[in-house]
Amino acid sequence: LTARITAATPVPLENVTTFRDVEGEVVDFVRNGFKPGFQVGLRNFDDIFSTYTGQFITVTGIPSSGKSDFVDQMIVGYNKNYGWKTAFASPENAPTYLHAHKLMRKVWGDMPSSADVHSDKWNDVVDHCNTNFFHIDMERYTLESVLKKGAELVKRKGIKCLVIDPFNKVRSTDQSGD
């Protein structure tokens, strides 16, 4: 019995990582540094910020300082550079057609005029926006319902980003009191 106990291989501890477990990744990091992340295509911003899939990004600032507009620009950049599709749960960007128009302008690169309606460029941009940007419209936004709809959009439409704007307008649970 003593010989068997001495010769037994220890069972690895759950949720514990040793240096040897990640040594290959450490060697790669020492030799190559951080792998470049995804960038939005804004030179000065890209010099200081890049992201990776699976990250949770919070954009903060004073009210009416352009946070939503900047996030929209980031999303259009990720779409242009990497083909990322995005869903928006954006209770403050109502009515939805105004937010859709903001995204269209960013994809268009300018403000389309009434003469542009139904032109070839108009139709191309509309098709692009229709297949790449999705608006989650709910009467009450709860974190659970938004994340559930986001998961559906991952499976059905292939979204890579879910924007919740503003996060403080999304309740953590379905509170019917107020």
Task: Annotate each predicted stretch with a short phrase.
Residues 63, 139-140, 168:
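A broadly conserved detector of short glycine/acidic/proline-rich loop/turn motifs that flank catalytic sites
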Residues 58, 135, 160-163:
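Structural motif
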Residues 46-47, 81-158, 172:
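Cytosolic-facing regulatory segments adjacent to core modules
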Residues 67, 122, 177-178:
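Residue-level preference for long, well-ordered alpha-helices that form the structural scaffold
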Residues 159-178:
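Helical hairpin unit composed of two closely spaced alpha helices linked by a short loop
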Residues 1-10:
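Accessory, often N-terminal, substrate/partner-engagement and coupling regions
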Residues 11-109:
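The Walker A/P-loop phosphate-binding site
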